[in-house]
A protein has these predicted regions:
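A broad "ordered helical/assembly scaffold" signature
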Residues: 1, 13-14
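Bacterial N-terminal signal peptides that target proteins for export
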Residues: 1-8
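Lipid interaction determinants
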Residues: 9, 15, 20-164
């Protein structure tokens, strides 16, 4: 009988402690975003298109900060064979270099104006397991962030507009 009372008390105490934990704050990025621009800021200050003239993309973030991001160059080559396993070198190159996709969790630091993407999976496997930080602005439903400089010194800039 004593062991039943102790077990019951322990279960009730753990439930009370669980309910006392503060709720995780909702991500300010929660929702669906569409890509407005994907550009590169060159070392000389010139801004150029990074994923062609009409890039497309989606960024979807849930209330806990889990995200999925896709950016595509609209001018990617179609595979002449219609078979992904039988592409030609230029078709594979266009598919890989004409897209940027990854998913994981994103943390917003509003004080420092930074986003931290904790990448779980990516089209570029070297990013998997990485924590990438970006400076951002968020105003009037438009999110703009800068990616750290590439080896050539160019800084990618992504601009997203909230859909919902």
């Amino acid at each position: 009988m004593k062991s039943i009372l102790i077990t019951t008390f322990a279960v009730l105490a753990s439930l009370a402690a669980r309910d006392a934990l503060p709720a995780t704050p909702e991500s300010p990025l929660r929702g669906t975003w569409t890509l407005v621009a994907a550009e590169r800021l060159l070392p000389d200050g010139e801004r150029v298109a990074d994923y062609g003239a009409s890039p497309t993309g989606r960024l979807i973030v849930d209330s806990q900060g889990r995200y999925s991001l896709q950016i595509f160059k609209s001018e990617r080559l179609r595979f002449a064979s219609g078979d992904k396993a039988r592409g030609k070198t230029d078709e594979y190159e266009s598919a890989v270099l004409g897209s940027s996709t990854h998913y994981g969790t994103v943390v917003v630091d509003a004080q420092r104006h930074t986003l931290s993407f904790r990448i779980e999976g990516a089209s570029f496997p070297n990013w998997e397991g990485a924590n990438q930080q970006r400076e951002y602005t968020l105003a009037d439903g438009v999110l703009t962030y800068r990616v750290p400089p590439r080896p050539d010194g160019a800084i990618p800039i992504s601009v997203w507009r909230k859909l919902d």
